[in-house]
Amino acid sequence: MEVTEKNRTKYRMPGEFEPHEGCVMIWPERPGSWNYGAREAQKAFVKVAEAIGVSEKVYMLVSKAQMENAKNQLGNVSGVTLLECETDDAWARDVGATMVLDEKGAVCGVDWQFNAWGGTFDGLYRNWEKDDRVAAFICRTLGCPCLDRKSTRLNSSHRL
């Protein structure tokens, strides 16, 4: 079937102020971004997760190598679920799925292609393959459809 304007599903990205189920964070560990074994960054991430976990779910993506450490620091924090997922850095907003709602209000995730903010020409770091898989992992884990970036077009309300 050919996709036309009439049969195309329309999605919208909810505002940050709208009710939502939870958020995704990535446990910091990458030496190029976090000095001293990321100890201070991890303490800060624990505080953020504690604050958020009071009012909504926190899904913390943690590498296999860091899982025991994360359990020790986050194991008693209310609302936090640890999920084993290998990543290249800790920027869930940039590498994760953009959650959108379809016309019926069902949640879907958009999997944008992540390239470390510039790719092979000017990217911040060379290996971002793990980060590029995070969005699909989040969608699978949360049980929501994952929209391919190639079939997604952004429009503002002024354009519609």
Identify the function of each model-found stretch.
Residues 1-74:
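N-terminal leader/transition segments
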Residues 4-8, 139-151:
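Conserved alpha/beta core surface patches that mediate binding of polyanionic ligands
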Residues 13-17, 89-94, 100, 151-153:
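Structural signature of eukaryotic scaffold interfaces centered on beta-propeller domains
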Residues 26-29, 62, 84, 102, ...:
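Pocket-edge structural micro-motifs
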Residues 59, 80-86, 144-149:
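General small-molecule cofactor/ligand-binding pocket signal
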Residues 66, 117, 160:
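Surface-exposed, flexible loop/turn segments at secondary-structure boundaries
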Residues 72-140:
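A generic, well-ordered mixed alpha/beta core segment in the N-terminal half of proteins
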Residues 150, 154-160:
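Single conserved hydrophobic/aromatic residue that forms the stacking wall/gate
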